[in-house]
Structures are given as C-alpha cells and as structure tokens.
Amino acid sequence: MTIKGNRMRLSSDSLSHHLSPSLADNSVVCLMAPTASGKTNLAYELYDSGRYELISVDSALVYRDMTVGTAKPNAAELARYPHHLVDIIDPMQSYSVAEFVSDVARLIDSCHQNGKIPLLVGGTMMYYMALLDGLSPVPVSDDSVRARVEQWRQDEGISALYDYLGKVDAISHERLNATDTQRITRAVEVYLQTNIPISDWQRQPKQALAHNPNQQWHALAVMPDRPWLHTRIEQRLDIMWREGLVEEVISLLERYPLTPSLPSMRCVGYRQVLEYLVQINHPVFEQSHLDKAQFYDAFAQSNLSSVESNEQDATTQSGMTQTHLSVATDQTEALACQQMQNKALYATRQLAKRQYTWLRKVMQLSDTAAEQATVSSAAPSTSIIGFDDMTASQNDKLILHSFITMEQARAYLC
C-alpha cells in the first residue's frame, strides 16, 4: 500500500543493472513493514527490474470495491504493476489464513516456473506468521457449513455459538472472549465440519511454507522511526477522507447485504465510518437488503451518548425554528465526523503498534535494541534461524533481516 498523491520514490537509478547475485532463483522474499511505511514504492521498483512478481500480503486488499480505505493501488497502477491476491473476493465473503497459505504456495511455484522471484509485500502479520512460523493443519471451511453457522449467528447471536462451543470444545471456550465473533464462529465451523475440536487441531505440528528445503526464504522486516510513521499515517488518512472513504462505505452498503460482523467491515477505517453513519442515522440503513438493527446493536454504546445528548437538547430544540434545528444537526454531524476521524487515526496507530510488536518478536529484537538501532551507520542486523525444533526432518534455514529504512532493504535486494 502507498500514500496516493504523495509517492515516496526511492533515490535510485534503474535496478536492472544492480540485482543482487546473492538471491538464488529459488528465493522467496517477504517485505514486512507496518502500514504507511512505503512498502509498495520499493515493490514497484523491484518489479521494474524484471526479476520479481508481486504477491499481496494484505487481508484488506483481497476485497473488490474496497479501494479508498485500503489504500489499494489504482487501476492504472495495477495494470502497470500486477499484484496477485488483490480484488479476489466480494466484501460479503471470507478469506481464511489457510486459504491464503494455499494460494501463496501455488503462486510461489508459478513464479519460479516463470523464472521470477516471488516478492510478498504487505502488512498483515497474521499471514506472514502462517507462512514463516507455520499453521496448524485445520481444514479449510466448507462453504455450506460456513453459511449454516453464519445464519445461526444472525438468528440467535454470538452468545448461542459461544454456549455451544462450551459443550463441544471446553478448551477453546475458556480461551476465547465471549465477544470474539470471528474466532468463535471459526471454532464452531471446524467442529461441525470435522467432529474434532479446533483446539485438538491446533495441538498438531505446524506446517510452514518457509520449511520447504527447495526454497530459500528471505524475510525482511522494516521498522521505521515511529514519529516518521505517525506523520505518514496522518497523511494517508487525510488523503482517504478527501478521496471519499465515507462515500465508498455508503456505496458498499447500497450494493451489498453487509453486516457489521463481516471481516471486511472490521477493517480499520471502514469500522469507524460505519459507526459514524449509525451515529448520524444515515438513511442508507433503510435499504431493504440491510438489517438495520444489527448495525445499531453493534454500535449501541457509542450511539447511546449521541441519543442521550439529543434527548437533553430536546426541550431547547422544541422552541427552535427550522433554520436553528438545521444548524444544530449540522453541528452534531460535524462533531460525529471529527470523532470518526480521531478514532480512525487512533485505530491505525494501534494497528502499527501491533505490527511493530510482531516484527520485533520475529526478528528477536527487544524493544531496547529496536530503539537504539541507527539509520545511518550500522549494517542491517541479520540472523539465520533453523526450524529443526519445529520439524525434525527439516534442515532448511530462514534468513531474517531487520532494517530501519526502506533504503536499507533496497540495498539488500540490489
């Protein structure tokens, strides 16, 4: 993803004459970095070298018609720089980590057959974890079971599924929060599909694509300065508001029978816009294909303060002229809009914080080491980690590198 309208081009000549001879033809490169850090710009330059194919590692870019809020490359960019795993499902659909891993395995083989190095670029750390650390062999959800469980959840609520989970999988029931809709739903799906609790599946040995002895994996983690990243995040969000994120969400609601519990509607930015639309009682929720009650229930607590405020002003407003009421409504909507923007900024910063935490864990960097790293002097830190303790028969190694800037990552790849 990239900040549109303000591209950060790396200071370099064409990469075509500077490709690193250390990257073998069987290499797989993961470019891991927090949101708004400039991953896409480097990916584009590497693609221009002619040696790479791009594979998106972003759980939001998989959705069609979700463009502004995901900072998705525009149509011209996607035509110039094709990405695998972008625009592959509708916002109504789900896309599991297991499905992602399966797709990536197929795409890696295809890239190598084409004489290209797969460049996996994005910020969804759960996806990277599945690729590098492994995934328990939990079966991919059956569509009919998934639809059945979703209907059950809509009819009786997540509490019914949580109670059922307590009867069939006590371990997962105790581990999961009662409001964790996504994981509870998945656990129930797995049990109904296999008759085996998901906790049993999760105890089985992990399987990771990075264990493949016929491939050389390079995992590059870029962890930029926090103040710099926070500025980039603010710039990105400003652009999203100007490009029409609110209008995009309204359009999605008009087009699809969405619910607030769908993974697509839990994406940062989209979630905050939904809450805003509920707070201002937007007429889009009157669409016949939408369950208005679900949206208002999902944001009941935040909407309550707005309702209480309106009730407190009711007596005063009863004596107002229509013009005064219109002004009051405009002020209320403006306040709700500002709250939406503040919440989206906070949520995006929290997302970046989680991404930093995971990257430090993977790179085996303590908070202190990360803070003391310098941009200008030291070479990027490197560690080579074997996975013999995870898979006794595997002797392959995963090469890990950490950087402060995209320039350092570029230097490694050039």
Curated annotation (Swiss-Prot):
The record marks T124, R146 as: Interaction with substrate tRNA. It catalyses: adenosine(37) in tRNA + dimethylallyl diphosphate = N(6)-dimethylallyladenosine(37) in tRNA + diphosphate. Its cofactor is Mg(2+). InterPro entries: Dimethylallyltransferase (IPR039657), IPT (IPR018022), P-loop_NTPase (IPR027417). GO terms for biological process: tRNA modification. It comes from the Bacteria. Transmembrane segments: none annotated. Residues 58-61, 182-186, 266-271 are annotated as: Interaction with substrate tRNA. ATP binds at A33, P34, T35, A36, S37, G38, K39, T40. GO terms for molecular function: ATP binding; tRNA dimethylallyltransferase activity. Gene3D superfamilies: 1.10.20.140, P-loop containing nucleotide triphosphate hydrolases (3.40.50.300). Its EC number is 2.5.1.75. The keyword Transferase applies. Substrate binds at T35, A36, S37, G38, K39, T40. The keyword Cell inner membrane does not apply. Catalyzes the transfer of a dimethylallyl group onto the adenine at position 37 in tRNAs that read codons beginning with uridine, leading to the formation of N6-(dimethylallyl)adenosine (i(6)A). Monomer. NCBIfam families: miaA. This is tRNA dimethylallyltransferase. It comes from Psychrobacter arcticus (strain DSM 17307 / VKM B-2377 / 273-4). The lineage of its organism: Bacteria, Pseudomonadati, Pseudomonadota, Gammaproteobacteria, Moraxellales.
